[in-house]
């Protein structure tokens, strides 16, 4: 593995030095190296759905706005904006110093200033049914958008939606060049031209992706120095997590994001701390992650025992989440003993949810048996292999209270399809926020969002919940909206269409010479201010 990695490293050096004669002197020590476990499917922001795509696209593109590490919406290409009193019209004033990455397709100047017309084109493209972008839903509440002037872009919503700016921070809404799209056609996925801190250099699919510093990037640090600091980003595609871990420990990768069962006990303790033997080599950082891991219960199955709330509550009380996190996740994650909304959001509901109460679980199970006459109740949990250990833990715990559990392990693709079609009575799932607002989580339980046309995988339906949800999406005042969110969250806990497992945490390992990497609740990899100590 070391020889293979060194060969690619030498290739990287050769390509960068030989092809960049017109650019500033290249410093190979400022190359940031990380690994993805599978190939990136596209470098087109219209297809920035999976994290591996999003991370690469984030280095290449900008949108109107962005999120800081505290999830506040801050300017990007839009330097300022105004929102109408009714909350429907957003008017953005654009910077006049943002240029597309240099390319001969732009003619003699090799680049072009970004204008409001580019955003108009980019948004139309996102909605184009021929493109089939998975991000078209972001603009489903948009009535119209237009370039009022070169430096002014306006969006009108069908109805007010306070989290809308957070939606615009998604990578789907990045600006692209019409000339580049028309020039490359279907090959644009592998020939991206954006405005971001890094520009495309080389992509050997399934092997390596290389991005180079954009010398014309518009953002500066607080001292006025141009960003980014790094010279390049090099991404490898080693599928084996154990191999990635070895490459990281040997210093051939600067950063590692995953924690796999094959090495988790070697690198961190059961309390979630870095093992002493690595403290002089590695920096570890953890933080809240907008991801709730849970078991979903499909409520439209006729004659299934999980339609009965007594069973769903018995499951929720019947296993020890704290023990599960400590021994199976080495303390990485927070037991989901409150609501469904994760702890990284300001509207997190500090209500008393489900804690381990085996006696209460047994009591609820006996009530179910007496009520239904079913003497030996049993359930099936469907999962993929990545979460088998968690499901087996729950299986053992529930069998101790008298509930028989079968685990069905299937491929991830089959699990996704089965969830969407109501095939499974209980399924393991997770919900990672697309934007930093609890509406993102509560939309999973709105009755008009039933799958396959929406994210309501459980087919939960509650008149009071729906009324609160419809009211909340137009409330501009954050505190008032958060109170409505918490009421909805309380209904979810009481009715138990889901079994919350834990609120996830971001975990990042980096080499000791990596500075200012940072961490955030949406687990975005932001490399603009990262640098490497020599």
Where are the predicted features?
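Extracytoplasmic/peripheral linker and loop segments enriched in polar/acidic and small residues
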Residues: 20, 310-313, 325-328, 406-416, ...
């Amino acid at each position: 593995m070391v020889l293979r990695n060194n060969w690619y490293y030498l290739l990287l050096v050769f390509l960068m030095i030989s092809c960049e004669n017109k650019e500033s002197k290249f410093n190979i020590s400022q190359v940031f190296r990380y690994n993805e476990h599978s190939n990136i499917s596209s470098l087109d922001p219209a297809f920035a759905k999976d994290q591996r795509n999003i991370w690469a696209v984030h280095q290449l593109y900008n949108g109107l706005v962005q999120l800081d590490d505290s999830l506040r919406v801050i300017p990007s290409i839009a330097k300022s904006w105004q929102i109408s009193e009714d909350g429907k019209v957003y008017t953005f004033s654009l910077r006049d110093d943002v240029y597309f990455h240099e390319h001969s397709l732009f003619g003699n100047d090799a680049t072009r200033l970004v204008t409001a017309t580019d955003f108009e084109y980019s948004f139309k493209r996102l909605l184009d049914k021929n493109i089939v972008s998975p991000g078209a839903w972001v603009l489903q509440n948009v009535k119209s958008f237009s370039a009022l002037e070169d430096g002014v872009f306006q969006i009108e919503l069908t109805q007010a939606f306070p989290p809308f700016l957070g939606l615009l921070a998604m990578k789907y809404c990045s600006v692209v060049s019409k000339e580049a799209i028309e020039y490359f056609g279907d090959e644009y996925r592998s020939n991206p031209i954006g405005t971001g801190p890094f520009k495309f250099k080389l992509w050997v699919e399934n092997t390596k992706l290389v991005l180079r510093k954009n010398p014309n990037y518009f953002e500066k640090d607080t001292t006025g120095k141009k960003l980014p600091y790094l010279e390049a980003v090099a991404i490898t595609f080693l599928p084996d997590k154990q191999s990635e871990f070895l490459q990281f420990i040997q210093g051939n990768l600067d950063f590692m994001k995953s924690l796999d069962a094959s090495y988790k006990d070697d690198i961190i303790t059961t309390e979630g701390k870095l093992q002493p033997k690595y403290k002089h080599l590695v920096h570890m950082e953890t933080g809240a992650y907008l991801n709730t891991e849970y078991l979903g219960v499909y409520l439209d199955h006729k004659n299934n025992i999980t339609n009965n709330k007594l069973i769903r509550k018995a499951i929720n009380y019947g296993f020890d989440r704290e023990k599960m996190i400590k021994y199976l996740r080495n303390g990485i994650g927070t037991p989901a003993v409150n609501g469904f909304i994760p702890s990284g959001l300001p509207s997190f509901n500090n209500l008393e949810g489900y804690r381990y109460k085996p006696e209460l679980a047994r009591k609820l199970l006996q009530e179910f048996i007496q009520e239904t006459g079913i003497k030996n109740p049993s359930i099936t949990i469907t999962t993929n292999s990545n979460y088998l250990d968690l499901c087996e833990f729950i299986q053992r715990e529930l069998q101790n209270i008298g509930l028989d559990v079968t685990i069905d392990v299937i491929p991830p693709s089959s699990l996704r399809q089965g969830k969407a079609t109501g095939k499974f009575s209980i399924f393991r799932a997770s919900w990672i926020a697309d934007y930093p607002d609890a509406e993102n989580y509560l939309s999973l339980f709105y009755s008009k969002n039933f799958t396959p046309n929406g994210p309501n995988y459980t087919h939960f339906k509650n008149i009071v919940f729906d009324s609160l949800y419809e009211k909340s999406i137009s409330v501009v005042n954050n505190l008032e909206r958060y109170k409505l969110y918490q009421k909805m969250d309380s209904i979810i806990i009481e009715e138990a269409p889901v079994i919350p497992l834990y609120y996830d945490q971001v975990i990042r390992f980096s080499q000791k010479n990596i500075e200012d990497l940072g961490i955030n609740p949406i687990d975005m990899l932001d490399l603009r201010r990262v640098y490497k100590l020599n």
